[in-house]
Amino acid sequence: MYTLLSGLYKYMFQKDEYCILILGLDNAGKTTFLEQSKTRFNKNYKGMSLSKITTTVGLNIGTVDVGKARLMFWDLGGQEELQSLWDKYYAECHGVIYVIDSTDEERLSESKEAFEKVVSSEALDGVPILVLANKQDVETCLSIPDIKTAFSDCTCKIGRRDCLTQACSALTGKGVREGIEWMVKCVVRNVHRPPRQRDIT
Amino acid sequence: MIEVVAELSRGPVFLAGEALECVVTVTNPLPPTATSASSEALAWASAQIHCQFHASESRVALPPPDSSQPDVQPDSQTVFLPHRGERGQCILSTPPKILFCDLRLDPGESKSYSYSEVLPTEGPPSFRGQSVKYVYKLTIGCQRVNSPITLLRVPLRVLVLTGLQDVHFPQDEAVAPSSPFLEEDDSGKKDSWLAELAGERLMAATSCRSLHLYNISDGRGKVGTFGIFKSVYRLGEDVVGTLNLGEGTVACLQFSVSLQTEERVQPEYQRRRGTGVAPSVSHVTHARHQESCLHTTRTSFSLPIPLCSTPGFCTAIVSLKWRLHFEFVTSREPGLVLLPPLEQPEPATWTGPEQGSRGSAFCTREN
């Protein structure tokens, strides 16, 4: 009887877990976005000073609960040398957030090339992609139409998966909640990538 | 299993502004013929230099923790944090440099990578004091996919020469090697140039010789004269001083002189308590000379400056100064010096001239 009640309790309150990759060039704001997300969606989370974020080598892990879903963020290092490791995480992920530095016009083509490799990978077929045009708090930043134009080569590769381009500022938090809520809707309804297997017993 | 070896080409002591060169060798140590031989894979390796600052809680009052929010995942084993698990806070670090990515090693195979980074000039020198510690390390992190990061730490010693921060490498190619027989490639030119300039500045600062005389007196009259030729020294040098006791009106039975450093916490960071105030100043004696000098008219002493000690410096939290500390045992009865005194000799303590009173020791300020 205890086992039945325990199982029922876990079944009613379990959260589906989804892994979300955060990709993009170095200094685009991936780790800042992760910190901002944790601050906004986790009530008890005491955020760190965003000015103390340094270059990521390896993997920042963060967990965010949104409704019945639990998002596990994997924030990967974006330096050029580290990008060859991204595809090792594709098979296990349910969503991709690609962060672009809207103020760095010089590296926009470099960012597009990295993005093209991401969406070209078969391991990410059907995986929703949220493109974040970050640093929109800066006055001189590129606008969403500018960025969409720069990335127009990649539209044919997106295919049938969900894709949204969202303006955001990870520093101020603008656009962060909307982006994540969109991602939650997409991963929940994506029947091709079920949530991570969890043992109920 | 993978073996990682880090080798510093010229030892662990550096001058701020110099380039640190390190060769990292990664080896799959299984012999090629081992029955269980298999290739090993590493996702990445990265290297970074950082300076860790630690303060004694009983002496130093740091700003409240609110203003310094915690590091992102300070104990994370998946992201490269060179100061993971260390006490104190990281106050300075260089950008991480990727040594390799996606490395596969067959049994018995080795690969070497070189790391080069200029040590920042805006940091403090290495220092292990009573109140604060500044510790530099080169940290190499390696990770397999889906495994924790393994850290290899190499302790460093960083010396800071005041005045070098403002010097920039000249843009023109007019800098010629000091010796016509030496040929240097471009990569080494800046380094040798900086070390050369530092050497020249040290030579200029520490070779100014002019005799400084100080009168030594106690309450009843003159004891003698202390003479010293320099106030700026290099590590490893000897502090040489002379004492002239022949013309004193007060007889000196014994004296001692100590070479000391004084570590002082800056006023705004001193720990204050209602009772039992912890000292904000502490002294360390590096060398001492003691001599019985009854009937001595002239003597001298030589105190070596240890190579492992820290030159004087000043940061926002702490300052270190060098000084000579004298103690004299004088006689009350000048006429009865041959007889044991009826009263205990009265020790008179007098602090001699501080080293580098015009600035820190080894400073390059002109006199």
UniProtKB/Swiss-Prot annotation, chain A:
UniProt modified residues of type N-acetylmethionine: 1
- CDD domains annotated for this entry? Arfrp1
* Expressed in which tissues: Found in most tissues.
Against Gene3D superfamilies, the record matches this protein to: P-loop containing nucleotide triphosphate hydrolases
Q: Which cellular component appears as one GO term in the record?
A: cytosol
Which example biological process does GO assign this protein?
A: protein localization to Golgi apparatus
Q: What is its main location?
A: Golgi
Asked if the record carries the keyword GTP-binding, the reply is yes
Record keywords, A-Z: Acetylation, Golgi apparatus, GTP-binding, Nucleotide-binding
Coiled-coil intervals, chain numbering = none
Keyword hit for GTP-binding:
yes
The listed locations are:
Golgi apparatus; Golgi apparatus, trans-Golgi network
Name the positions where GTP binds. Answer: 24-31, 75-79, 134-137
Among Pfam families, the record links this protein to: Arf
Q: How does it assemble?
A: Interacts with SYS1.
Record's function text: Trans-Golgi-associated GTPase that regulates protein sorting. Controls the targeting of ARL1 and its effector to the trans-Golgi. Required for the lipidation of chylomicrons in the intestine and required for VLDL lipidation in the liver.
Protein family (similarity comment): Belongs to the small GTPase superfamily. Arf family.
Q: What is this protein called?
A: ADP-ribosylation factor-related protein 1
Q: Whose protein is this, by species?
A: Rattus norvegicus (Rat)
